[in-house]
């Protein structure tokens, strides 16, 4: 027979906490702990007095800073939605522009009197969504638009992509004017029907871009 008197599990430890006048912080303090690093607070709980001070989270400077930041985020999100309503609308187009010399361009006129424009440094992972599309290697003509000088062409006849050399070649009707500027627009979302945004075209119309290099007559 044991001479130990049964005691309530954890009773001795609980009595010690009560003697110290310490109680567990309310559940709100758990949220406070989760966000403590995010708000760059250096306050730490070094003594039992510090723990006791969290009994009323509303009186904690860290908790008040957390509430302030959360309210500021809500205000910022509402302001962004007001200024940029596009953030709440479905995204139908995502347009990338290739311009010379960032993407080096060169051209020639072949014997069929067609303009061949070559654009280098274009990665396959930008043109294609997956490895299957890369293997097929057929750029979708409707995803591209070509601007020569300040005019966006109505017609692109063919598009080819050299995987090894990362060169995109566009065939289009030859132009009567001297070619001073060329921009290739690519809609990443591959929409069949889309237009180049006016603000984007205006931007490139006003920019002084380097003209594409003229190559010898090709076949």
Swiss-Prot record:
Residues 103-134 are annotated as: NEBU-like domain. One of its GO terms (cellular component) is host cell nucleus. Its main location: host cell. Keywords: Host cytoplasm, Host nucleus, Late protein, Virion. It is found in: Host cytoplasm; Host nucleus; Virion. Residues 1-34 are annotated as: Disordered. The keyword Plastid does not apply. Residues 16-33 have a biased composition (Basic and acidic residues). The keyword Mitochondrion does not apply. It comes from the Viruses. Interacts with viral envelope protein E18 and the DNA-binding protein p6.9. Contains a domain homologous to an NEBU domain that is known to bind actin. Plays an essential role in nucleocapsid entry in host nucleus. May act by binding and stabilizing F-actin in the infected cell, which might attach to nucleocapsids and then push the nucleocapsids into the nucleus. This is Protein Ac132. It comes from Autographa californica nuclear polyhedrosis virus (AcMNPV).
């Amino acid at each position: 027979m044991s001479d130990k008197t049964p005691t309530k599990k954890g009773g001795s430890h609980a009595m010690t906490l009560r003697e110290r006048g310490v109680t567990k912080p309310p559940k709100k303090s758990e949220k406070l702990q989760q966000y403590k690093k995010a708000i760059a607070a250096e306050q730490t709980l070094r003594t039992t007095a510090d723990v006791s001070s969290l009994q009323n989270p509303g009186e904690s400077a860290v908790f008040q800073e957390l509430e302030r930041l959360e309210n500021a985020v809500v205000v910022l999100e509402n302001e962004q939605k007001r200024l940029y309503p596009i953030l709440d609308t479905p995204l139908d187009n995502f347009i990338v522009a290739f311009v010379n010399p960032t993407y080096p361009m060169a051209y020639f006129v072949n014997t069929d009197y067609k303009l061949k424009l070559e654009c280098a440094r274009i990665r396959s992972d930008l043109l294609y969504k997956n490895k299957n599309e890369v293997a097929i290697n057929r750029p979708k003509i409707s995803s591209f638009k070509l601007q020569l000088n300040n005019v966006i062409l109505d017609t692109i006849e063919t598009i080819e992509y050299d995987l090894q050399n990362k060169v995109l070649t566009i065939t289009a009707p030859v132009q009567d004017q001297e070619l001073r500027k060329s921009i290739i627009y690519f809609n990443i979302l591959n929409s069949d029907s889309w237009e180049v945004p006016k603000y984007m075209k205006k931007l490139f119309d006003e920019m002084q871009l380097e003209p594409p290099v003229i190559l010898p007559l090709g076949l």
